[in-house]
Amino acid sequence: PLVDIRAAGTNHFTWIVSIHDKRTGEDLYPLLRKRFFELDESFEPLTRRVFRDFGLFPVPGDTHLCEYLPWMSGPVAKPWEKFNIRLYDWELMAGVRDFSLDRLNEMADGNMTIDGLLETDSEGALEMIENVAYGGNHYHLAANLPNVGQIPNLPWGTTVETPVHVNGAGIHPVHVGPLPEPIAELCRRELIVAQLGVDAAGEGSYEKALQCLLLGPVIMDMETSRSVLDDYLQTYKEHLPQFWK
């Protein structure tokens, strides 16, 4: 690649912090900003608004970005209509899942060759395994690792997403520096929500599970949070005995 792009944040919630021409070192962020805002306003309108208001380009795309933003679920304003956010087609995805599972079972039983998998995009896993196992030297644009200072203004030890170097000694995070504080605060909220969810499940803590939902960006009132939790715990009671001691 002729362009060095660095993005950082939390899992799937990353922001381009720098973009440079590898040959000349030129900062390409002004060009990215210019070209993106020249696109039709109907293209990724939520990304456009967040880019404008926060100053960095959010990577996920509108239908994923909306999951992390606390102002995208209000039932009165209905921002999903303004930004043309559509739900996933659950029936379609369920069909794809069942088809894929049947196909894999056929391969496992020897009734189908694995040739169809050879060109499947690995999303980086294959390259990482190969370079660790065989002592290679690979630069990967995004991977999740514990924060050991690669993003110094996010909590130490939490899982963050940054570029990484991969070689025979393992996977090593690239230091990207601090995120702008408003963006860091959005990421911190996600990290706290994730930790509360883990702690709630591990401890069987109703209180922490409720706090997880109350802090999450997609439920807008306290009663709904409690109702969702109660319904979930009742529906999956047999799988969550720690909450029923």
Where are these regions (language model features)?
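Long, compositionally biased stretches enriched for glycine and/or charged residues
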Residues: 1-245
